[in-house]
Amino acid sequence: MAESYLLEKLQSVDQTYQELTHRLADPDIATNPDELQRVARLRSSLEETVLTYDSWKQTQEELIGAKQILKDAGGDPEMREMAALEVEELAEKLEELEKKLKILLLPRDPNDDKNIMLEIRAGTGGDEASIWAGDLVRMYSRYAESQKWTVKLVSESLADMGGFKEAILEIQGDRVYSKLKFEAGVHRVQRVPVTEAGGRVHTSTATVAIMPEVDDVEVQIDAKDIEITTARSGGAGGQNVNKVETAVDLFYKPLGIRIFCTEERSQLQNRERAMQILRAKLYDLKLREQQDAVSSMRKSQVGTGARSEKIRTYNYKDNRVTDHRLGQNFSLAGTLEGDIEEIIQSCISQDQQERLEELAASPETASAIN
């Protein structure tokens, strides 16, 4: 690993890890549970990098030794063959460890561990776009279930012919944002709609937004900026729904954002849910402003989450899904059933590769971007 800045960073991580280990061994830390948890969590986040770095150093020493054996083998063909094979294997192992270390050293997205609000809006295509939005709700629900995440529909605007004009899913689980952030953008479908009598293929779209959940400390909202009205709501609650106004219509005046919540059983719960969605939307806007500010520094982008970015086309006639960022095709049937892990992992890998290239080209620029 010739890059001196990477070695310096690894040495710094190793030193920090050792200091945290000593800190955890101090009996005094047990008297402060919050500090104990913070230090333990930080140490755990560095552990894989440190262990990989240790393995890299050991492999490097073994490679030096194997090269010396090969050099000293002289005219012994059997010894030379064995030593040459070991040199080759160790060199390959060292290269793989270097790749892993570079990825581990990439700055982590601070939102990666967060739960999300996933918003799907019908785009161009009329009734067919709403039906398509409903198909995407099902696809993401299936994927979330396969990941052992929990999914809840927290806001919806139903369309007359089926599907949704707009739907918001709350998805909770392990590192939800780290995977689904690559799904933000425009999803285009090409198929013959059920409402089409002539059998012609139509093109419709739906827009997906991925919003990390935030609390009221991260996003503060002035009470005078919101206007809340209530209405009677259908759904859970039995006869109560006909007597009590449980639905909440929240309007955020500065940006004209309207949120309608009916899914909870009480007005208070729907009000809290509407505020939760509003905070996520405002935080998402702030994130996108930050991304726009640095996007000119990036030579290329994968899954930046731009609302206008057409990321994928679902072609029913050819039973094919094309991800335009990857330039790859996938099975339509499997994708619609929520089998999108391969697509997501490919996006993660490509994003890591681009960031590594930026890091190699200019460590200072890469640091600024992240």
Curated annotation (Swiss-Prot):
Intrachain disulfide bonds: none
One annotated GO molecular function: translation release factor activity, codon specific
Pfam families for the chain: PCRF, RF-1
Main location: cytoplasm
GO cellular component, one term: cytoplasm
Processing after translation: Methylated by PrmC. Methylation increases the termination efficiency of RF1.
Record key words, sorted: Cytoplasm, Methylation, Protein biosynthesis
Keyword field contains Transcription regulation: no
N5-methylglutamine sites (modified residues): 239
Cellular compartments annotated: Cytoplasm
Xref: Gene3D superfamilies: 3.30.160.20, 3.30.70.1660, 6.10.140.1950
Cited function: Peptide chain release factor 1 directs the termination of translation in response to the peptide chain termination codons UAG and UAA.
Family: Belongs to the prokaryotic/mitochondrial release factor family.
Name this polypeptide is given: Peptide chain release factor 1
Taxon lineage: Bacteria, Bacillati, Cyanobacteriota, Cyanophyceae, Oscillatoriophycideae
